[in-house]
Amino acid sequence: MAREGKRIRAAREGIDPTKVYSLTDAVKMIKDRSKAKFDETFEISMNLGVDPRHADQMVRGVCNLPNGSGRTVRVAVFARGAKADEARAAGADIVGAEDLLETIQGGTIDFDRCIATPDMMPLVGRLGKVLGPRGLMPNPKVGTVTMDVKGAVGAAKGGAVEFRVEKAGIVHAGIGKVSFDDQKIVENARAFADAVARAKPTGAKGTYIQRIAVSSTMGPGIKVDPASVLAAQSA
């Protein structure tokens, strides 16, 4: 623990917790301070001016990161017949129907994203209490209930990141790896922030995107100027 504390203190050196940095400067600072023995995930956190307890202030969506997420995503697909074949051909890791339902009910959830064709939703709906809390329930709003199985599997494998606002009005996601080039991380961060901006709910009042911070898995958070992240949107 002492070693970990020393490493964290070292990572914080040179970072002014009261200062707001540009996105490019923050990315460089995080990469320069990354000393973990694994390829850390680069994370973004956004504080939004919404209260998700109200239905008209819920923020949810999906972002296709232009440079991928850097992680291997296991995809499960509920489908039958030709659509099941399409899912397998597209690279889905698990494909099934009642058999997949039984596997999940038995406690085995060996996937990161779940996709379903519309006709499978009565079956998948029985898994709401299992998949819902894990953020794995297929939803047409984020493109995971669809007849375009090939496209959905490809998006999931290629770096599509789902987001949903939490109780405190925070949206966060992993948007790459510290090993990525600086520009690739910047592009991913801007794409994610733009997706969140476009998902602004009708009930949001006042400043929608209030604060943004970035960090690595094991590193400290760095405050970022929203204007340096939002390319074409107003904070």
From Swiss-Prot:
Record keywords, A-Z: Repressor, Ribonucleoprotein, Ribosomal protein, RNA-binding, rRNA-binding, Translation regulation, tRNA-binding
Gene3D superfamilies reported in the protein's UniProt record:
3.30.190.20, 3.40.50.790
Q: Name one GO molecular function term.
A: rRNA binding
Cellular component GO terms, alphabetical = cytosolic large ribosomal subunit
**Family assignment from sequence similarity:** Belongs to the universal ribosomal protein uL1 family.
Chain's role: Binds directly to 23S rRNA. The L1 stalk is quite mobile in the ribosome, and is involved in E site tRNA release. Protein L1 is also a translational repressor protein, it controls the translation of the L11 operon by binding to its mRNA.
State whether it acts alone or in a complex, and with which partners, per the record. Part of the 50S ribosomal subunit.
UniProt-recorded name of the protein: Large ribosomal subunit protein uL1
Gene name on record? rplA
